[in-house]
């Protein structure tokens, strides 16, 4: 599926403001970007899993054991962040399928190509995101 999308999009294609916003080619471009990102995360996670399985369970030296446990904790937190990112990628792919990708979930306005290229899982315009973060900060400070 990814190879078919790559062929239809083209190797050097980058979405442009000169095109119709979220036309079929742009949607395919972002679908390709998201699928490649998801694959790279899966590949990295497999390496992490292998490291955890290969790592010594019982280090004879207490310092070595503490170091291994710290490394494991970091690996597991990284995997948790990756799991959450994959959920965001899957959500973005569903929005593409539903015809909602590229539009702010709060205002319905276009998110913008530059923002989506930088952060393909973005669900809000910069302005809506900033307002959301301000509200979160205020509620945390209370």
Region roles according to the model:
Residues 104-108, 125:
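Short cysteine-rich clusters marking metal-coordination/redox-active sites
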Residues 114-118:
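Short Cys/His-rich "knuckle" micro-motifs
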Residues 98-100, 110:
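Short flexible coil/turn linkers enriched for glycine and charged/polar residues
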Residues 34, 108, 129:
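Cys/His-coordinated zinc-binding microdomains
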Residues 101, 122:
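Residues immediately within or flanking Cys/His clusters that coordinate Zn2+
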Residues 111-112, 133:
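Short functional micro-motifs and their immediate structural scaffolds
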Residues 1-98, 135-136, 141-142:
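Interaction interfaces in information-processing and related assembly proteins
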Residues 112, 125-128:
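Zinc-coordinating Cys/His ligand positions in small cysteine/histidine-rich zinc-finger domains
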